[in-house]
Amino acid sequence: MRRFFICYIGFLSIFLDFILADKDNNSEEERDRKFDWKFENENGKPEHETVTVPKLPDGSYFWKWTWNSRINSTTAATPTSTVTTSTSAPTTSPRVYKLKSEARKSLRKALRGVPPEKRKKQLKKMGKKMMKIPKITKKESNKLHKSYRKVKITENPPALDMFEVNERAGLNEYLFQGDINLNNNQIAKISSEQSSKSRRKKRQIDNLAQFWPGKVVYYYFDSGLTTTVQQIVRDAITFLESNTCLKFELNSTATNRIFSGVGCYSDTGMLGGEQTLSLGYGCEVTGTAAHEIAHTLGLFHTQMRSDRDDYVTIDLTDVPESSQQNFIKLTEATSTNLVDYEYGSFMHYSGRAFVSSGGVDSIVPKDPVMVYTMGGRIVTFLDLKMLNTHYSCSCPTILSCGNGGFTNPANCSVCICPYGFGGALCTERTDYGCGSTLTATDTWQQETYTFGNASNSATARPSAVYCNHWIQAPVGKQIQFRIDSTYNTQCVYGCTFNGVEPKLKSDMTITQARYCCDEFNAEIMTADFGVNPMPVFSFNRYYKTTYTWSYRYVDSNVTACADTSDKATCLSLKSAKEQGCSIYDTAQLKVMCAATMDLCGKVASDDGTCKDRFPKSQCSTYSTNGMCTQQPPLAAEFSCAETCGFCTNPV
């Protein structure tokens, strides 16, 4: 095959005639290719040279050309596949994607009068002022990347992630963190905050992004936006309106424009005047639209939080210097840490963020099992809680929501529930038309189901479909779960096409590990004591997926009153409680961390009174159905303490 590239390097115009040498020779697994270089030198004389170019681990090719020691240009061809992630850093090459002309045109519309090259310089200058990210040695890096399981990443997935779309459009050097269009004031604020002199000053909370007045966002669709993208935006808006106090009004005179540019990006917060949100080709995903709208509402990426180093390790080993400013961490003065750190947030980078081709991951979670969960595009329960807290959404009456849910400000008669739970008070199994309630025994039982849509075999759908199972077991038993086999799963960072999430931990509000890679099959996972029922939440947005998994219960040696969450989580919750910034009430804390909180044998309530958390009618039914004794004692006490008799005999 012949391909033609034109490269302008300094004084040279180099015409590259790409020749695949000796196609029938498969030595060294066809790792090397020959390139025939034809060019004119500085004196206008034609010259010619043939060079052998090594193939990189990701399928791309690396070449370097030097002219009189003044020119050093490195380019990588677009890779045709991805590879198994490795434990050490292989030879890498930065992907070089120049800003395309169409991307430049749409970017000019969004930059509010700032020339693209000036914005590029501003971001580069801001990056030089960023707080030093602790550098880790090669030995430390190798150890870090041995902490999590390596998987075979799916080759040629059905769609690119939004950050890959922007990278290939050449937008990375012109947008902050790959998709944020900062204004001059925000750049100045971040630069000031990152300087060592400013960091020594005690500062008050200073939001980088302004709120939308009246909690109303006015917008209109640019004439070039397709009906498909318009519907995707409407779907994202409908979801956000149904779960927050925010309102979006379509108005042709609005200055906030959603347009079909090149790439996926937006402004952050309410800026005043014309604002833009770009959803170009490759951005036709409901989660991507919601992600960019969330930026418009004032949210930054999760890994920018001031406390991020408690949850992830940043490894810049294979991140080009020009991209390292994207790993800026905010200070407590500007970081909005309103909910627990959420690995599965739709605002979190994946572990591959800004990594050179073939390099090691740039973000590694302290909880290694979460490495392939980061980078998801499903709006999580805590994402919704973050938005509602950020905009002070509330209801006149607070409902007694179960399983960590909270009153829905868009409909104060129901709760917003963690995935896996539904009903008015989050006490029922969410029915998506797929899934059922299963009863575990002490022997393995198997469940197989297929869901999705066979009509989209060529590309991924804009939105996912869900399936939800509950596994129940007798009181005092612990549920075990094992994935046996899968069909048509795409193993990618973020599990953006399909995945299964067994909710094993007692805190149902957080996104738990999602599995979309076969390397985790056959592993026996044990739920925390007291997790009963245990939801198994699964999703699909490409073709059809089949899951086969097994479940059973085992005896537990955990006492009735004990921590049901891991020690690190309980110590963190205890610290937050002591500092007066806990998002949980005393009853919730007892269910999760009774021993650490020293709540065993004590009435768990903020005001010292013992009462049912749910309405009397529901607790009466709860007791009649035998749930006071069938459920784990801590769970029964939490739900209906008075009706179940725990006021006189606390767990």
Swiss-Prot record:
It holds the Pfam family Astacin. Residues 380-433 form the EGF-like domain. The keyword Nucleotide-binding does not apply. Residues 1-21 form the signal peptide. Residues 203-394 form the Peptidase M12A domain. This is Zinc metalloproteinase nas-32. The gene is nas-32. Binds 1 zinc ion per subunit. The active site is at 292. Keywords: Cleavage on pair of basic residues, Disulfide bond, EGF-like domain, Glycoprotein, Hydrolase, Metal-binding, Metalloprotease, Protease, Secreted, Signal, Zinc, Zymogen. Disulfide bonds join 245-393, 264-283, 395-412, 415-426, 434-467, 495-516, 610-647, 619-640, 628-644. Glycans are attached at residues 25, 72, 251, 411, 453, 557. Residues 434-554 form the CUB domain. Metalloprotease. Its EC number is 3.4.24.-. InterPro entries: Astacin-like_dom, MetalloPept_cat_dom_sf, Metallopeptidase_nem, Peptidase_M12A, Peptidase_Metallo, ShKT_dom. It is found in: Secreted.
